[in-house]
């Protein structure tokens, strides 16, 4: 893994008046490029083969230049070239997936956020330790499938985009659906409304919703649209569907906007605060954008089952701002908020606090 000291050495050669914001052309890159351009940065899109043609349809978000690779792993070998352009990499899920975790953490280019958070997020045991230390309610984990007494969610290790999930209500259903060649986690199925909560933690701002160090913002929230789970039950009851050979899947295909009851916002902020404070104690903080995936029950309990320590695709709903971010700054997207953080840190000589 690249060290903080190495990153600081790279920054000594940077022209901070000519920073380039770069990411892989996927996931939330249009939003990232749009936000960077609004804050006066040059942008660089990373892609394999020729640049995506559909980017031409969005001129305000199309990057100023492209870095075309034969393979995403070749990005590691282009680090010096990127540094000469004063590049800061903005990670998103696709970037980490295409590069691989080891390549991402070892990439010799200054990167927004704390790369150590990937290790804590992707390791289920470490993530559980993080959540439990933060005092967060989580769905009960079931170690032995024979102990399944009601609906459970089974998730395969490394599930991406909603692939690798299934629901079972007893051991028999579990046995019929499980792939024993893969590692999996079983936890109770929580009945409620799913919320993806989009936060931003700034270690360099000391106004707004302040923490022991820095401040916390709630930028937006969304709910996932999943195929085929969101439409399948129009065809019949779950048992009828299974008998017909049709099983629900949870592949992410899009997102829809949400706002929460105002009375819940206090708990939503407390939840984010607990996550950040514990991250500061464990590994130096979850800097920048992050998302808590939770279910809010009919008794208004919030149970957390996942965390993403970077910008998530649900924020793409709010390129022109959300009902929450508009109350802080007009037309503030998560992509633009990232660019603002970099801009403010560069001006105040605090890039060391937000890059890794």
Swiss-Prot record:
Protein's UniProt name: 5-formaminoimidazole-4-carboxamide-1-(beta)-D-ribofuranosyl 5'-monophosphate synthetase 2
Gene this protein is translated from: purP2
Function: Catalyzes the ATP- and formate-dependent formylation of 5-aminoimidazole-4-carboxamide-1-beta-d-ribofuranosyl 5'-monophosphate (AICAR) to 5-formaminoimidazole-4-carboxamide-1-beta-d-ribofuranosyl 5'-monophosphate (FAICAR) in the absence of folates.
Domain ATP-grasp residues, every copy: 101-333
Database matches in PANTHER family: 5-FORMAMINOIMIDAZOLE-4-CARBOXAMIDE-1-(BETA)-D-RIBOFURANOSYL 5'-MONOPHOSPHATE SYNTHETASE, 5-FORMAMINOIMIDAZOLE-4-CARBOXAMIDE-1-(BETA)-D-RIBOFURANOSYL 5'-MONOPHOSPHATE SYNTHETASE-RELATED
Binding residues annotated for Mg(2+), in chain numbering: 293, 306
Cofactor(s) for this UniProt protein: Mg(2+); Mn(2+)
Domain of life: Archaea
Enzyme class: ligase
Organism (species): Methanosarcina mazei (strain ATCC BAA-159 / DSM 3647 / Goe1 / Go1 / JCM 11833 / OCM 88) (Methanosarcina frisia)
């Amino acid at each position: 893994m690249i060290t903080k000291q190495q990153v600081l050495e790279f920054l000594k050669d940077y022209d901070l008046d000519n920073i380039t914001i770069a990411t892989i052309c996927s996931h939330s890159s249009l939003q990232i490029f749009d936000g960077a351009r609004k804050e006066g940065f040059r942008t660089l899109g990373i892609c394999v083969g020729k640049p995506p043609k559909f980017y031409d349809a969005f001129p305000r978000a199309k990057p100023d230049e492209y870095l075309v690779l034969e393979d995403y792993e070749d990005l590691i070998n282009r680090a010096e070239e990127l540094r000469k352009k004063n590049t800061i990499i903005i990670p998103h899920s696709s970037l980490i997936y295409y590069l691989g975790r080891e390549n991402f953490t070892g990439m010799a280019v200054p990167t927004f956020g704390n790369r150590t958070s990937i290790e804590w997020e992707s390791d289920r045991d470490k993530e559980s330790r993080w959540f439990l230390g933060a005092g967060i309610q989580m769905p009960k984990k079931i170690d032995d499938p024979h102990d399944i007494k009601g609906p459970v969610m089974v998730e395969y290790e490394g599930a991406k985009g909603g692939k690798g999930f299934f629901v079972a209500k007893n051991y028999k259903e579990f046995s019929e659906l499980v792939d024993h060649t893969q590692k999996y986690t079983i936890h109770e199925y929580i009945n409620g409304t799913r919320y993806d909560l989009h936060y931003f933690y700034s270690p360099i701002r000391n106004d707004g919703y302040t923490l022991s160090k820095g401040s916390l913002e709630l930028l937006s929230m969304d709910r996932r649209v999943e195929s085929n789970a969101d439409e399948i039950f129009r065809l019949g009851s779950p048992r009828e569907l299974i008998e017909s050979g049709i099983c629900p899947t949870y592949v992410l295909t899009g997102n829809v906007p949400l706002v929460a009851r105002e009375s819940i916002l206090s708990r939503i902020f407390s939840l984010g605060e607990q996550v950040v404070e514990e991250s500061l104690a464990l590994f130096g903080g979850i800097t920048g954008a992050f998302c808590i995936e939770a279910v809010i029950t009919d008794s208004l309990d919030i149970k957390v089952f996942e965390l993403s320590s970077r910008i998530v695709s649900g924020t793409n709903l709010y390129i022109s701002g959300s009902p929450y971010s508009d109350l802080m700054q007009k037309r503030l997207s998560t992509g633009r908020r990232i660019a603002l953080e970099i801009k403010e840190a560069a001006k105040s000589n605090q890039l060391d606090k937000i890059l890794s």
